[in-house]
Amino acid sequence: MMKKIYKKNQLLEVNNIPSEVIESIRETIGVLNENYGENRDIEADLGGYVLIAENIVDIEILKQDKLQGLIPEYTDIIECSEGVNWTSSLFLLSSDFAIVVVTTEELSKFLLE
C-alpha cells in the first residue's frame, strides 16, 4: 500500500525502509515545507508530497491515475548499505505541485517505462 508523506513526523510510522531512504524523504519534505508551509492542505494548496510505492500494484495505480501521461523531471538513485537501492523520481503535476515517488530500483523500471 502506498504511503503519502508530507510531514516529517509521519516518517516515524514508516517501517522496513532503509535509513538512507528515510533521510532522502526527510530532506524532500523539508524543502516542500520550507517553500509551501508545514501546515498546508495537501490536497488543496501548492507544494506536493512524497509517495512511497512498495509494490507493482502501487506503481500501476499511480500510472493510471495521478501520473498518467507524465514523465519524471529527474530520477535519483538512493544508494543503500543494505544492498537494495531505491530511487526518488520527481513528477511535476503543475508549476507549483509535485509528487516525488520513492520506490525500489527494481520497481522504478515499471514506473519509468
Label each PLM-derived region with a short phrase.
Residues 1-22, 103-106:
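Short, extreme N-terminal segment that most often corresponds to the first beta-strand
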Residues 21-29:
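Membrane-topology and secretion signals of cell-surface/extracellular proteins
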Residues 111-113:
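Short acidic DE-rich linear segments
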Residues 36-107:
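Acidic, low-complexity, intrinsically disordered interaction modules
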